Amino acid sequence: MPKRTDIRKILVIGSGPIVIGQAAEFDYSGTQACLALKEEGYQVVLINSNPATIMTDKTVADTVYIEPITLDFVTQILRKELPDAILPTLGGQTGLNMALELANCGILAELNIELLGTKLSAIDQAEDRELFKNLMNQLNEPIPESAIAHSLDDAQEFVKQNGFPVIIRPAFTLGGTGGGIAENAGQLKTIVKNGIALSPVGQVLVEQSIAGYKEIEFEVMRDRNDNALVVCNMENFDPVGIHTGDSIVFAPVQTLSDREVQMLRDASLKIIRALKIEGGCNVQLALDPNSERYFIIEVNPRVSRSSALASKATGYPIAKMAAKIAVGLTLDEIYNPITGTTYAQFEPMLDYVVAKIPRWPFDKFNKGDRQLGTQMKATGEVMAIGRNIEESLLKAVRSLEIGTAHLELDGLTSVSDNDLVQRIIHPQDDRLFYLAEALRRGYLIQELAELTKIDLFFLDKISHIVELEEQLRSEKGDVELLEIVKKNGFSDEKIAKTWQITPIQVRQMRQESGIQPVYKMVDTCAAEFESQTPYYYTTYEQENESLVSAKPSILVIGSGPIRIGQGVEFDYATVHCVQAIQKAGYEAIIMNSNPETVSTDFSISDKLYFEPLTLEDVLNVVELEKPEGVIVQFGGQTAINLAAPLEENGVKILGTSVANLDRAEDRDLFDQLIQELNIPQPVGKTATNAPDALTIATEIGYPVLIRPSFVLGGRAMEIVHTPEDLTHYMQEAVKVSDEHPVLIDRYLMGKECEVDAICDGQEVLIPGIMEHIERAGVHSGDSMAVYPPQNLTEDQKAAIIDYTTKLCLALDCHGLLNIQFIIQNDEVYVIEVNPRASRTVPFLSKVTQIPMAQLATQLILGSTLAELKSPTGLLPAGPLIHVKAPVFSFSKLTRVDSLLGPEMKSTGEVMGTDVTMQKALYKAFEASGMHLPSHGNVLMTVTNQDKAQALALAERFREVGYQIIATPGTTQQFKAAGIPVQQVDKINATSGDLLDKIKAGHIQLVINTTGLNEAPQVAKDSIVIRQTAIEHGIPLLTSLDTTDAILTVLESQSLLTKPL
């Protein structure tokens, strides 16, 4: 059936900020869908609150709204735009829940707007646990015994009949939020209460646990003529019980018989047909390893994280197809864009193995709860392609960028047998490495299968890797063995370490023996048809399928997996860089390892290499392609760290030179530069050991800011107030800095500002200055930023422009440079210079309308600002005010302290834009989920040094209609100043516990600040207060500057009531 002509304008709902469970995969699917709809001639309107995405670029949709995805704002846009239809299935859980809200409030019926792709009834049937259960019973598809619970009593009733363990799944939530496995009454109470609180409909499913079954996923598509197909099937390495987003996954399935695959395939197609979904859908199934018994776990009636993985694993662009099906096209009318000759109704076939490994944030949150279960904790993921499981698994391990190139971790060899077994039974993020260690110690795969319920087949593959390690040790220098281990994914680094030579010597040995990697194409059809796509992976075989073109090329290094500190912003910059390279007439080649992103969409670049971002893998691509040069500015710290080793191996780095990158990153060289330019900076020195550090800190004077050099996202950064704290930090953090010294600076309390500049070596363009709302001491990635700045004097701006220009020219910068400043007592200090694209580039590009990454790329390729007729100096600001606000994922990460400081903790960002500061702030808070009622109770527990400032804020809260609740110390001070306060006892007191007040919903906002030199009990209590607020979804502020900003919003909305 041809596409529909009765609709013209379509609204696409984006997925909002990146949080755990909903990351860059929705930027990828949303971008694909918008472009596909435009390709078919429809007018596309997009709403998304996340400025760091490609999909919010003006070129992706016809009209782009960066506004909060809330009922009020979306309704306002619907009334203004009057679209014919809405496509909600590409914006993750956010998009689906929004579609339901819009339907339920009646606006869609009123404006006669149709829902495309998946009907409301299907969304309801898949997401509402009770309707889903009824549908499965009608279809005669088995699901685990379960009951819907709206209260703890309901859940206890089910357990009485069915016993423990049970799995609890809240309805309409994302990434398993609020769910878990309960093995006893205590756990049941905690998880059920939490789950009901976090479910938007106050409903959880309690089901008999099938933990230990094999977890299988089918990614299926269907069109309106009822054609349906399986795009990809995937098998979780970890059994049921660990969220699929936290599982290692292989595609295609590895351990099932043909009969089992067929059985699960039939069930998946039966379900998508019964739900009448038009587009993509993900079905999760559990298979009993000892029989052919299976259960349906759940169905996602939308494009998901798994569909991004399936798209990249097969080359079949699911989101693009889903968008075309949504407007009436059928699978037998749409061409498969990879082959260009076959239609989309052919099921992809794979002649390789894909491995996905999640990337967790525990390198930043070393106190976080690392236990894996039904609630997702990973921030991102990597994917690798190989000809066998060993190869794809080891390639994926080295893509993670966690400091290891093999199945080994520091300190594993010294773990006791007892601890080893415990870590294998109770899975954490690093279980894979413990399994390998157990096999090295002689444990049998049968024993490990018994303990973990992981299939023997997978354990045997790890065992094979361990056997090859053993052989490597005993047969040093054996060329035949070298070829075997390379075919099994071993890195040159691992071989070098075992043979006690350097990786470059291993490389030379390989080259002399003709053991060279070849590149194979991802073509959706196992080489059955001719393919058009330039999408490749390496392996050690005979025939190379990647043909080098005669056109000069540029290689761009991507930013790898999404993690805290290095998010989708860097992918945004990478994609823009590629677009500029293509416009300049070069062939653009991307190398990256992240399946969720736009940059790894094969249609973006001229060639895509899906490979780990390590020196060995990049050199392999460089040797084949012989590009004009490599660009490292846009891939975050991942790419910058490769610059020097690449240059040492004769690779040309484009843009700012490696020597100048080093001058910005190396502390001593940077200090020299700052002194030469006569630019003020906080007093600071470097130390390589604890005694040095103590001496320096005493000289400079406490408090000091201490951090390792060469880091991103403030990794292991702290403000230290006492020598004891410093000693403790040196024991913890110097381990972090491997051979790099730590930097110790005088900590300045002041206003923080930030600049992204673009330079061609002669002239400098400063698109804008951003002012942070939070004072120095909160990481810039966790601060709210305002553009244009609201509180800078002309003199301060002039100093910022002067220092920026001097630094750009002194570093002979070609491309982008990010500088952070502190202003204290009217003096402007430089605190940090990053010679690369920073995480503020997308935000600043959107608000200034300067395509910064593209412009920077043109300069990297040799153009000048003058030739491009670009303005220079500080650009004049427009009439609107823009606020960028961070978004956190603390509700997914138990035991991670939500107190903001110099270590970055946010996972995503939103933006609010309006004509006044108050309105822009209001939008930013709304978009980030921080919605405050106009009145209520605010709990204030603040540290002594904050009490004076808190007093003024408390008075303002009273004025707008809030009642103040405080602990005894704060109450005393407030009462003395004449502010009415309700006192609550501290946590350890016996009566009227303040935690009960939070749990019972009596408190609408918690403000909690702690000093670093608090008494241990006070600090502990503060953590419990913050954790309780997060668990119960109560807005929490840990900075008085943010509190001041929220008050500004509340004041602007409250009407004056004053007696005559």
From Swiss-Prot:
Region (Oligomerization domain): 402-546
Annotated Mg(2+) 3 binding sites: 820, 832
Keywords: Amino-acid biosynthesis, Arginine biosynthesis, ATP-binding, Ligase, Magnesium, Manganese, Metal-binding, Nucleotide-binding, Pyrimidine biosynthesis, Repeat
Free-text comment on the cofactor: Binds 4 Mg(2+) or Mn(2+) ions per subunit.
Catalysed conversion reaction: hydrogencarbonate + L-glutamine + 2 ATP + H2O = carbamoyl phosphate + L-glutamate + 2 ADP + phosphate + 2 H(+)
PROSITE patterns, alphabetized: ATP_GRASP, CPSASE_1, CPSASE_2, MGS
UniProt key word S-adenosyl-L-methionine: no
Residues reported to bind Mg(2+) 2: 298, 300
EC number(s) on file: 6.3.4.16, 6.3.5.5
Keyword Transcription: no
Domain ATP-grasp: from-to ranges: 133-327, 671-861
Annotated spans, Carboxyphosphate synthetic domain: 1-401
CDD domains: MGS_CPS_II (cd01424)
Binding-site positions, Mn(2+) 1: 284, 298
NCBIfam families recorded: CPSaseII_lrg, PRK05294.1, PRK12815.1
Assembly behavior: Composed of two chains; the small (or glutamine) chain promotes the hydrolysis of glutamine to ammonia, which is used by the large (or ammonia) chain to synthesize carbamoyl phosphate. Tetramer of heterodimers (alpha,beta)4.
Family: Belongs to the CarB family.
Functional description taken from the UniProt entry: Large subunit of the glutamine-dependent carbamoyl phosphate synthetase (CPSase). CPSase catalyzes the formation of carbamoyl phosphate from the ammonia moiety of glutamine, carbonate, and phosphate donated by ATP, constituting the first step of 2 biosynthetic pathways, one leading to arginine and/or urea and the other to pyrimidine nucleotides.
Protein name: Carbamoyl phosphate synthase large chain
Organism: Latilactobacillus sakei subsp. sakei (strain 23K) (Lactobacillus sakei subsp. sakei)
